[in-house]
A protein has these predicted regions:
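Charged alpha-helical initiation segments
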Residues: 1-78
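Alpha-helix N-cap/helix-start motif at coil-to-helix transitions, marked by capping-box chemistry
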Residues: 50, 54, 130, 154, ...
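Glycine-rich, flexible loop segments associated with nucleotide phosphate handling
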Residues: 72-81, 128-133
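Residue-level detector of well-ordered alpha-helical segments, enriched
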Residues: 76-83, 91, 156
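Short non-catalytic regulatory patches outside canonical folded cores
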Residues: 89-155, 174
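Charge-enriched, short contiguous segments at helix-coil
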Residues: 144-192
Length: 192
């Protein structure tokens, strides 16, 4: 077997060092599942949340290791915001389903499928199936009405939701959204 050239060896060492740095201090998906999501009722959801959080944190660390700035930093932040928003949206769904099971949902939004309150909500035999048909906006409103989250967190989540929705490029252009490091930090803080 032919030995690797010094350039290949150096390149591999560099890649390994960046990978070690990116993984340092973020925990494994299994650790994140236990540390951050043990309150989530659904086992599959808990695992998916931990994997998504791991990916977002790993991208953050990778951006640090590569000293990402400008367009590269914007790309890193965009993906992190989308992931943090997805985590928040899923956590709200889980908490709403748990509150529904306990009969503690408040307000009237939870009785309607849409935020305009035109289509009655049919929770049916499996509330998890019903909740999957709702929007992030609906989940924020129901959570706030039910006291699951306060108005400050609801405002932060609406901001994250709007940033996440700029995955639709025409909306990004229309809204004039520019991704910057603080945006990912705020999304991460709201998720916590």
């Amino acid at each position: 077997m032919k030995s690797k050239s010094i350039q290949e060896q150096f390149g591999q060492e560099l890649i390994d060092a960046v990978a070690r740095f990116a993984k340092k201090e973020i925990g494994t998906p299994e650790q994140l599942e236990e540390q951050d999501f043990k309150h989530v009722a659904d086992n599959e959801l808990r695992k998916a949340l931990a994997e998504t959080l791991y990916g977002a944190r790993w991208l953050y660390k990778l951006g640090l290791a590569l000293l990402a700035n400008g367009d590269e930093q914007s790309a890193h932040v965009r993906v992190q915001v989308i992931d943090y928003a997805s985590i928040c949206e899923a956590l709200l769904a889980d908490m709403i389903v748990q509150a529904h099971a306990k009969g503690v949902l408040a307000g009237d939004q939870h009785t309607f499928f849409d935020v305009r309150k035109k289509s009655p909500m049919n929770w049916g035999a499996d509330p998890r199936t019903s909740i999957h048909k709702t929007t992030f906006e609906w989940r924020i409103i129901v959570s706030q009405e039910s006291g699951i989250i306060d108005s400050s967190l609801a405002t932060s989540l609406h901001t994250i939701r709007n940033h996440r929705n700029t995955v639709h490029l025409t909306l990004k252009i229309r809204e004039g959204v520019a991704y910057y490091a603080g945006m990912a930090r705020r999304a991460h803080s709201a998720m916590r």
